Amino acid sequence: MNADKTQAIWLGSQKYSRAKYMPHLKMVWNPTMFKILGIWFTQDLKECATINYNKNFDEVKKLFKIWSLRTITPLGRVAILKSLILSKLIHLWILLPDPPDNFVKDLQKICFQFVWNGKQDRIARKTTIKDVKSGGLNIPDIKTYILALKLTWIKKLKISNHKWRNIPMELYPFLHQLECYGPCFFNQTVKNNSFRADVFKAYGIFCSKVKPNSTSQLLSEPVFYNKNMMIGNKMIKYTQWVDNGVYCIAHFIKENGRFCTLAEFNTKSGMTVDFLTFNSCTSSIKQYIKKSTILISNNMADEVNISLSTIYSAPKGARLYYNILVNDNCMPNCCLKWSEKLKSNISWNTVFIKVQKIKDVKLKWLQMRIIHRIIATNIVLNKMGVTANTQCGFCNDKKDSIEHMFWKCAYIRRFWTSLETILKEKCETALNVKFTQNLVLFGTEIDIKTDTVFDLVILQAKQFIYKCKLDKCLPTLSCFLQQLMLKHKIDEYNAKISGELPTFIVNWLCYKPILKTENG
């Protein structure tokens, strides 16, 4: 034992003792704080969470100030936020009770300010907290993120073989039968430990988000302490039935999908349940089944309910839990505005999946600004007093708008026609290509298949058009092909470094002729 690096502290009933043993070792006795595995502890465990959050929050604020000085796109700021800043707090959120609400509120406010560089949010927060393929920016919703991290303990309780698991299992024997009870049971049972209470609070919220969508999933739903099945506005609490193997909907159903009679149920379960209790219980179950609109034709249930099976089968980490918790099945407002404005059917799922696959951060951010209708046009700039009028900067004939800037303007249409012509002349795979408004704006069109390089060409063309607008010059095909050739060289070099050169060469094989055109 290295006495110089050893500290001793009294805990429990003797925590205020001043006794010191082995004084010859010159150990530090009763330090005000001590650190184990990155967590600061004191004699009063209730203070641990506050002390750790305050210490790390100060460090996080310094990182925000440092990175705020950099000129980075919002997508780049999100990456920094998740990988370099919030990573300082993740281990605390996993291991300690949830931080106080004011801590979460302050941190969330700073996160949004950082992403938007201290300016007003340009996209609704309920959208930005979603992942990119759902139309968001992946800005972490701190409260939900903490819930998702706490949910990882439910999976650990099931699959871990480490000895720490024996402690909660010994303290709470019902953890061996998680599938037998609804989430409210754990909320009411685990109250004397704030950390474990937070874990099961997260589980309860998760259960409210995950709904069964098949017969077997519905039949595996627990009946007891489940808010979906109530008797007189009170949850069913016949937990003593669990000892007789009765806890989910399937145990009230016969093989043909019909409900058991009272006599059949008593025979099957080995219990003696009175008619009133049985009838009230089955009535609440029938109401729940009716609301679910799922037909019951058998009594074959999954081993565990849908919430637990989702948790157990999730890949490592908390990403899946977080995405489920933040998902509200609502499309971003921009989708409704575009559909109303263009009067066309757009597969927004396809649009956002394509955005997610864009590797170049600047191109991805340009595309997201177009989709979310936040890219600067002269109409907006005129209201801000930046431009003298609202007319298009190219034709000076029509009012500027996103669709006009990238498609409807006569000069821009001429540019797209020239690009379409050279693609058809030089690229065999592009013989049937025809640029449309949806294909240009959103990268997808019904009945038109594209590949990775073609999508990149469209993105590069839009970036070129926007740069020409800022530089107040007309876009020409020759200048664009020069920029495309430069982009090709950069991507080729990156592919060579990353060992992806063969794939890169194959992808570009059909499009090399348009680059040779520019080379002369």
Segments (PLM) and residue ranges:
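Short, conserved micro-motifs composed of acidic
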Residues: 2-32
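Short Cys/His-based metal-binding microdomains
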Residues: 384-439
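Short amphipathic alpha-helical coiled-coil/interface segments
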Residues: 85, 104-115
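Conserved, non-catalytic sequence blocks in retroelement Pol enzymes and Pol-derived host proteins
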Residues: 45-52, 69-76, 95-103, 355-360, ...
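Long, charge-rich boundary regions
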Residues: 424-470
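Basic, alpha-helical interaction scaffolds
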Residues: 25-98, 118, 151-159
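Short, conserved catalytic/metal-binding micro-motifs enriched in Asp/Glu and His
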Residues: 34-44, 85-97, 134-144, 367, ...
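Extended C-terminal regions of large enzymes
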Residues: 93, 107, 120-376, 469, ...
